[in-house]
UniProtKB/Swiss-Prot annotation:
GO terms for molecular function: 3-isopropylmalate dehydrogenase activity; magnesium ion binding; NAD binding. The lineage of its organism: Bacteria, Pseudomonadati, Pseudomonadota, Betaproteobacteria, Burkholderiales. This is 3-isopropylmalate dehydrogenase. Its EC number is 1.1.1.85. It comes from Ralstonia nicotianae (strain ATCC BAA-1114 / GMI1000). Pathway: Amino-acid biosynthesis; L-leucine biosynthesis; L-leucine from 3-methyl-2-oxobutanoate: step 3/4. The record marks Y136, K191 as: Important for catalysis. It catalyses: (2R,3S)-3-isopropylmalate + NAD(+) = 4-methyl-2-oxopentanoate + CO2 + NADH. It is found in: Cytoplasm. SMART domains: Iso_dh. Homodimer.
């Protein structure tokens, strides 16, 4: 039986994950779903954001459905005990190196975007972000007395940006394969003009391209990519980039769509086992109010069905149900436009179930 680890986390995580679970149960499939604490909830229950039992469950499961972690009240904890360390730990222990962040603007929601509707209506970008390398994980790092330079002897913070050839090759293959199934256009985003790491990145991606002649490859500096995402976002199909640039660009692309509350994400290992979560955070300011948008989490469950569980038809059912609900005019507050019906978290989940 397919086993899904359900990790709601903190803030609105419990509310939105409950709606995704409700939708999954409506499909008529037989899933074994087991829930465990993570993030701040893990710290409260077991003294660590990623308790051993939770990690064991995640390793045993076929897929992980994740909510969100984080709360201001944990900001004073040592870094290793903060809720955000849970997601970093899961990525590391499960070797989740490929992050898929779709940025889709449904025609019904074009008016909710801060951009002109004609710029974003019909937008469909997939950002493929490398998750386990780059400056976020490079060693050495820390705080020390500066060994040289104008301020030698002064305290300085330092990090190390690095990528190995195997890391670049495997994410490039994932991105080219994704592009081959879509519009056959891949844009590799780097900063090769000033960073040795990303000149190396560019060289390796160019070499991998030889295996995918049907895909059109372009290269773009990250500063220009940030501008072009605002100026002409529909020129992009699939974007591949490193950990830090992907972190920033995927959030920028998300806001083109009108609400980050609509956007799912997937983090995959080499065998397509994945962790699926909404692109947004735990939003502690609205937790418990029943107003959070559950659609990103519901669509994350659809991605789980498609990429890990091999049930593309069921994924299509969920995605089509979401489109139907939007066409019917149901909106949570974050995507509300004049003339639509405002609903809460549970009501939106119920509407998707009804559409199914």
């Amino acid at each position: 039986m397919t086993k899904i680890a359900v990790l709601p986390g903190d803030g609105i995580g419990t509310e939105i994950v409950a709606e995704a679970v409700k939708v999954l149960k409506t499909l008529g499939e037989t899933f074994e779903m087991e829930t465990a604490p993570v993030g701040g909830a893990g710290y409260e229950a077991k003294g660590h954001p990623l308790p051993e039992d939770t990690l064991k469950l995640a390793k045993e499961a076929d897929a992980i459905l994740f909510g969100a972690v984080g709360d201001w009240k944990y900001d004073t904890l040592p870094r290793e005990l903060r809720p955000e360390q849970a997601i970093l730990g899961l990525r590391k222990h499960l070797q989740l190196f490929a992050n898929f962040r779709p940025a889709i603007c449904y025609p019904e929601l074009a008016g909710a975007s801060s951009m002109k509707p004609e710029i974003v209506a019909g937008l469909d970008i997939l950002i493929v972000r490398e998750l386990t390398g780059d400056i976020y994980f490079g060693q050495p790092r820390g705080v020390r007395a500066a060994p040289d330079g104008l301020f030698a002897g002064a305290r300085e913070g330092f990090d190390t940006m690095r990528y190995s050839e195997p890391e670049i090759r495997r994410i490039a293959h994932v991105a080219f394969q994704a592009a081959a199934k879509r519009g056959k256009k891949l844009c590799s985003v780097d900063k090769a003009n000033v960073l040795e790491t990303f000149q190396f990145w560019k060289d390796i991606v160019t070499d991998v391209h030889k295996e995918y002649p049907e895909v059109e490859l372009s290269h773009m500096y990250v500063d220009n990519a940030a501008m072009q995402l605002v100026k002409a976002p529909k020129n992009f199909d699939v974007v591949v980039t490193g950990n830090m640039f992907g972190d920033i660009l995927s959030d920028e692309a998300a806001m083109l769509t009108g609400s980050i509350g609509m956007l799912p994400s997937a983090s995959l290992d080499a065998n397509n086992k994945g962790l699926y979560e909404p692109s947004h955070g735990s939003a502690p300011d609205i937790a418990g109010k029943g107003i959070a948008n559950p659609l990103a989490t519901i669509l994350s469950a659809a991605m789980m069905l498609r990429y890990t569980l091999g049930k593309a038809e069921q994924a299509d059912r969920i995605e089509n149900a979401v489109k139907k609900v939007l066409a019917q005019g149901y909106r949570t507050g974050d995507i509300l436009t004049p003339g639509c019906k405002q609903v809460g978290t549970v009501e939106m989940g119920d509407a998707v179930v009804a559409a199914l």
